[in-house]
Amino acid sequence: IDNVVDKDKFENLKALNDAELNVGYLSEVQILKLKKSMKETFNKGLSIKTLASTLISKDIIPHLYTEIDGEKVIKLNQDIRSLIVARTETIRLSGLGALENYKNNGIQKTRWTAAISDRTCPICLELNGRVFIIDSFLTDVEYPAHINCRCALSPVVIE
């Protein structure tokens, strides 16, 4: 990623993003249950909203709490948090599956395409249009870049 984004700028943006997410990490048990639910949902061809509902009904994704003035307050409710996890993990798996498909068909490069709008984050703006060798992308780049990332990966067949 060194040749794509100024390393200090990238690390600063990533640190801000990580700080926001660290309080919401899932336990190993929750991750295993999430994977199982995702597999079942995908195998049945169901939607992201259905996956989010499953995560709620099985109590896999709880409310995210914070403390304000010594009082425990809901920072992110279970409904919204489940939808965010379902959407982000679906995008991640879809993108990684696409990269494997590209590789299996002899395509060696991928292009990062950001959904450009007033909501596009600085990381995605920096990565937009960049071309990566798939093998190094899989080890060097975080995809999706953050929760609710709307970016896509496309094959590069002609440069």
Residue ranges and their predicted role:
Residues 1-145, 154-159:
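Domain-core detector
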